[in-house]
């Protein structure tokens, strides 16, 4: 059995990790930690776990005494909060999957520019592995620290990677228009997340300065060995969970829709969790699953390729992708514990 600990277990992503790891046939949950609910039973925070998870959440001081009992620790904390425990865990030889943005950007100056805090573990950035399994499976197998991708970044990179790697589009023409459910804002109390503030409305935010922008650019640039700059605009929509990314770029090769679909199908032919659909995609078809559904189209009038990509932000955009990474890291079938169809209603 893989012995795991979860730090930050009572946030939306943390509780999703608990759900997935509880039903995983190869996992034993050794401890759950929470900054806000230390000393409380996990199922008193989330009543749906009564009878299933009886664990009491522990504080960080106690975590340090329990780390020796685990093989891997999941960090489900906001950015800037995981540095101490990542360093502590790595020094003990424990594998780490970090779900914050703290180790995604390889350039510490870029991190400091976008996240507005100094990076105290610059040396660790050299060997952190970007945990997007469909694209970096070989690196993940050898990792000691996996930085789980952001939700917007996951949907966008998966949608655009074939276009970049196959050199099908003008690199400077990429636009990503993305929508997220409200759970993407986290569980902490924020005015903009209150029901009356976010229901029956839509709004753009982070225009020109969203932190997933450099993450998307960095990973796409790896495929063409040149710096890609793109336009990324996220929006908040009144649904609980889900990401819908619509990606646009100018074609530089003479392709029709059928040829483009075939190129995508071949690119992802060995990736179980990627579905290239003939139909237009919808968020509800991937809800509560680890799947990424995408649809490709060409606007012949403007010579634009349009790729629509949908994921569940708490699953493929966070927790289930982290479990997929763990499976790869420990050499088990990456579908283990994740072969779950969407619950569309």
From Swiss-Prot:
Pathway this chain belongs to: Amino-acid biosynthesis; L-arginine biosynthesis; N(2)-acetyl-L-ornithine from L-glutamate: step 3/4
Enzyme Commission identifier(s): 1.2.1.38
NADP listed as a keyword: yes
EC top class, as a word: oxidoreductase
Active site (UniProt): 151
GO terms, molecular function: N-acetyl-gamma-glutamyl-phosphate reductase activity; NAD binding; NADP+ binding
Gene Ontology cellular-component terms listed: cytoplasm
Compartments in which it is found: Cytoplasm
Keywords: Amino-acid biosynthesis, Arginine biosynthesis, Cytoplasm, NADP, Oxidoreductase
PANTHER family registered for this protein in UniProt: N-ACETYL-GAMMA-GLUTAMYL-PHOSPHATE REDUCTASE, CHLOROPLASTIC-RELATED, N-ACETYL-GAMMA-GLUTAMYL-PHOSPHATE REDUCTASE, CHLOROPLASTIC-RELATED-RELATED
Protein name as annotated: N-acetyl-gamma-glutamyl-phosphate reductase
Gene name linked to the record: argC
């Amino acid at each position: 059995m893989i012995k795991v600990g979860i730090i930050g277990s009572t946030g939306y992503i943390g509780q999703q990790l608990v759900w997935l790891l509880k039903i995983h046939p190869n996992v034993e949950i050794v401890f759950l930690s929470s900054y806000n609910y230390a000393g409380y039973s996990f199922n008193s925070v989330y009543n749906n776990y009564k009878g299933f998870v009886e664990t009491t959440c522990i504080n960080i001081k106690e975590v340090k005494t329990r780390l020796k009992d685990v093989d891997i620790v999941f960090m489900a904390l906001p950015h800037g909060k995981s540095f101490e425990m990542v360093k502590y865990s790595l020094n003990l030889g424990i594998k780490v999957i970090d779900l914050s943005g703290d180790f995604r950007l390889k350039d510490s100056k870029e991190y400091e520019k976008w996240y507005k805090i100094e990076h105290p573990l610059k040396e660790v950035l050299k060997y952190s592995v970007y945990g997007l399994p469909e694209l970096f499976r070989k690196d993940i197998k050898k990792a000691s620290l996996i930085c789980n991708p952001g939700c917007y970044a996951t949907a966008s990179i998966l949608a655009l990677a074939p276009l970049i790697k196959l050199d099908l589009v003008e690199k400077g023409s990429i636009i990503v228009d993305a929508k997220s459910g409200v759970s993407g804002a986290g569980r902490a109390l924020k005015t903009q997340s209150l029901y009356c503030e976010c229901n029956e409305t839509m709004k753009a935010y982070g225009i020109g300065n969203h932190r997933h922008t450099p993450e998307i650019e960095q990973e796409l640039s790896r495929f063409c060995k040149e710096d890609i700059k793109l336009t990324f605009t996220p929006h908040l929509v009144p649904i609980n969970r889900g990401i819908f990314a619509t990606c646009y770029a100018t074609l530089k090769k003479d392709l029709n829709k059928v040829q483009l679909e075939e190129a995508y199908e071949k690119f992802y032919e060995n990736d179980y969790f990627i579905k290239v659909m003939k139909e237009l995609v919808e968020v509800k078809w991937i809800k509560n699953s680890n799947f990424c559904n995408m649809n490709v189209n060409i606007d012949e009038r403007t010579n634009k390729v349009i790729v629509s990509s949908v994921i569940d932000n708490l699953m493929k955009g966070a927790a289930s992708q982290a479990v997929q990474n763990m499976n790869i890291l420990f050499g088990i079938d990456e579908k283990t514990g994740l072969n779950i169809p969407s619950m569309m209603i």
